[in-house]
Amino acid sequence: MKAILALEDGTYFEGTSFTGPGESGGEAIFNTGMTGYQEVLTDPSYTGQMVCMTYPLIGNYGITKEDIESAKVHVAAFIVKECCKHPSNWRSVMSLPEYLKEAGVMGIEGIDTRALTRHLRINGAMRGIISTEELDPEKLVAKAKQLPTMEGQNLADTVTSETCYAWQDGKPVPVDVSSGYKWSDKGPRLVLVDYGVKWNILRLLDEQGFEVLSVPSHYSEEQVRALEPDAIFLSNGPGDPAVLDQAVKNAKSYCEDLPVAGICLGHQILGQALGGKAFKLKFGHHGCNHPVMDMESKKIEISSQNHGFCVDISDCSDLKITHKNLNDETLEGFAHKTKPIIAIQFHPEAAPGPHDSCYFFARFRNLVKDATGK
């Protein structure tokens, strides 16, 4: 079925829908990972984005139950050079086209993804639309121009959990905290603020011995403190960090007397809470092959990344840079000089990607132990 991808600057590509008829729009970006498409599809941080995979063949190992990062597909649309309809993998339960059809998400193949990637790299991420229903490029370009830009959007509140849940036996278990929460105290009490968390973050925090309770992004500081946590964790998530005023205000309060860590959007929220400024990157960092330097050890780590925004802490005298991106030298991590506060912009939990930076969770565990004795 013929489909057209049209961008707001007038550029368009003709291809074929591998998910049937439909129309979908969002911010067009590219991901440089060769594998890991299932984790990409289910990462809440991709909400509102049409993801172009730079590797030419996607879908050859199908879809597995074990590799999802949230309860549903979050991308606005999926763009590939060629989609494999007949996967080969003993764990696979369905093909990529079947998975996207079931989720109601548009998929397009047969376009020149290399040309699209180069265009986005040169001109920046931009609004776009994919359609099988309207095949007039000019009309689609006009539609793309009407879509909201990523800047100014609070998407975290659209993907956060509706209720609190504990992470138990490798899965989220809803809990009622209206009358308080009974901790088992088998480990430090960790409240994770869910801005669109990936499940592998929860798995690795659990492995470190934390007793993890996740709360929705709209939870107030008073509600969080009523749970009597030993530490706070700010998760990854989608959208513009500069509009999350309440989240930044809450984080600033937590930093006064609690150990705090953040990943991705959580890193940006923490950075702003401590005096930094958020800004949008030209085309973002999306993929599992981004080189990052640990500024203390000078070790180079290959990291999994997914962010379109960054934070500038150059005017924050209380913070030190712990990680730097070697491609564009943007900030990838910081720590407070005197308080148990650390954050990184990339994804140490991988899923997909290398495990070079998994030590982040152990590092936070040690900070919490030193601060609380637990």
From Swiss-Prot:
<dbReference type="InterPro" id="IPR017926">
    <property type="entry name" value="GATASE"/>
</dbReference>
<feature type="active site">
    <location>
        <position position="347"/>
    </location>
</feature>
<dbReference type="InterPro" id="IPR035686">
    <property type="entry name" value="CPSase_GATase1"/>
</dbReference>
<feature type="binding site">
    <location>
        <position position="308"/>
    </location>
    <ligand>
        <name>L-glutamine</name>
    </ligand>
</feature>
<dbReference type="GO" id="GO:0004088">
    <property type="term" value="F:carbamoyl-phosphate synthase (glutamine-hydrolyzing) activity"/>
</dbReference>
<dbReference type="InterPro" id="IPR050472">
    <property type="entry name" value="Anth_synth/Amidotransfase"/>
</dbReference>
<feature type="binding site">
    <location>
        <position position="237"/>
    </location>
    <ligand>
        <name>L-glutamine</name>
    </ligand>
</feature>
<comment type="function">
    <text>Small subunit of the glutamine-dependent carbamoyl phosphate synthetase (CPSase). CPSase catalyzes the formation of carbamoyl phosphate from the ammonia moiety of glutamine, carbonate, and phosphate donated by ATP, constituting the first step of 2 biosynthetic pathways, one leading to arginine and/or urea and the other to pyrimidine nucleotides. The small subunit (glutamine amidotransferase) binds and cleaves glutamine to supply the large subunit with the substrate ammonia.</text>
</comment>
<feature type="binding site">
    <location>
        <position position="268"/>
    </location>
    <ligand>
        <name>L-glutamine</name>
    </ligand>
</feature>
<comment type="pathway">
    <text>Pyrimidine metabolism; UMP biosynthesis via de novo pathway; (S)-dihydroorotate from bicarbonate: step 1/3.</text>
</comment>
<feature type="binding site">
    <location>
        <position position="45"/>
    </location>
    <ligand>
        <name>L-glutamine</name>
    </ligand>
</feature>
<dbReference type="GO" id="GO:0006526">
    <property type="term" value="P:L-arginine biosynthetic process"/>
</dbReference>
<comment type="similarity">
    <text>Belongs to the CarA family.</text>
</comment>
<feature type="binding site">
    <location>
        <position position="265"/>
    </location>
    <ligand>
        <name>L-glutamine</name>
    </ligand>
</feature>
<keyword id="KW-0436">Ligase</keyword>
<keyword id="KW-0665">Pyrimidine biosynthesis</keyword>
<keyword id="KW-0055">Arginine biosynthesis</keyword>
<dbReference type="GO" id="GO:0044205">
    <property type="term" value="P:'de novo' UMP biosynthetic process"/>
</dbReference>
<dbReference type="InterPro" id="IPR002474">
    <property type="entry name" value="CarbamoylP_synth_ssu_N"/>
</dbReference>
<keyword id="KW-0028">Amino-acid biosynthesis</keyword>
<feature type="active site">
    <location>
        <position position="349"/>
    </location>
</feature>
<dbReference type="GO" id="GO:0004359">
    <property type="term" value="F:glutaminase activity"/>
</dbReference>
<dbReference type="GO" id="GO:0006207">
    <property type="term" value="P:'de novo' pyrimidine nucleobase biosynthetic process"/>
</dbReference>
<keyword id="KW-0547">Nucleotide-binding</keyword>
<feature type="binding site">
    <location>
        <position position="239"/>
    </location>
    <ligand>
        <name>L-glutamine</name>
    </ligand>
</feature>
<comment type="pathway">
    <text>Amino-acid biosynthesis; L-arginine biosynthesis; carbamoyl phosphate from bicarbonate: step 1/1.</text>
</comment>
<dbReference type="Pfam" id="PF00117">
    <property type="entry name" value="GATase"/>
</dbReference>
<feature type="domain" description="Glutamine amidotransferase type-1">
    <location>
        <begin position="189"/>
        <end position="374"/>
    </location>
</feature>
<feature type="binding site">
    <location>
        <position position="306"/>
    </location>
    <ligand>
        <name>L-glutamine</name>
    </ligand>
</feature>
<dbReference type="GO" id="GO:0006541">
    <property type="term" value="P:glutamine metabolic process"/>
</dbReference>
<feature type="active site" description="Nucleophile">
    <location>
        <position position="264"/>
    </location>
</feature>
<dbReference type="InterPro" id="IPR036480">
    <property type="entry name" value="CarbP_synth_ssu_N_sf"/>
</dbReference>
<dbReference type="InterPro" id="IPR029062">
    <property type="entry name" value="Class_I_gatase-like"/>
</dbReference>
<protein>
    <recommendedName>
        <fullName>Carbamoyl phosphate synthase small chain</fullName>
        <ecNumber>6.3.5.5</ecNumber>
    </recommendedName>
</protein>
<feature type="region of interest" description="CPSase">
    <location>
        <begin position="1"/>
        <end position="185"/>
    </location>
</feature>
<dbReference type="Pfam" id="PF00988">
    <property type="entry name" value="CPSase_sm_chain"/>
</dbReference>
<keyword id="KW-0067">ATP-binding</keyword>
<feature type="binding site">
    <location>
        <position position="309"/>
    </location>
    <ligand>
        <name>L-glutamine</name>
    </ligand>
</feature>
<comment type="subunit">
    <text>Composed of two chains; the small (or glutamine) chain promotes the hydrolysis of glutamine to ammonia, which is used by the large (or ammonia) chain to synthesize carbamoyl phosphate. Tetramer of heterodimers (alpha,beta)4.</text>
</comment>
<dbReference type="InterPro" id="IPR006274">
    <property type="entry name" value="CarbamoylP_synth_ssu"/>
</dbReference>
<keyword id="KW-0315">Glutamine amidotransferase</keyword>
<dbReference type="GO" id="GO:0005524">
    <property type="term" value="F:ATP binding"/>
</dbReference>
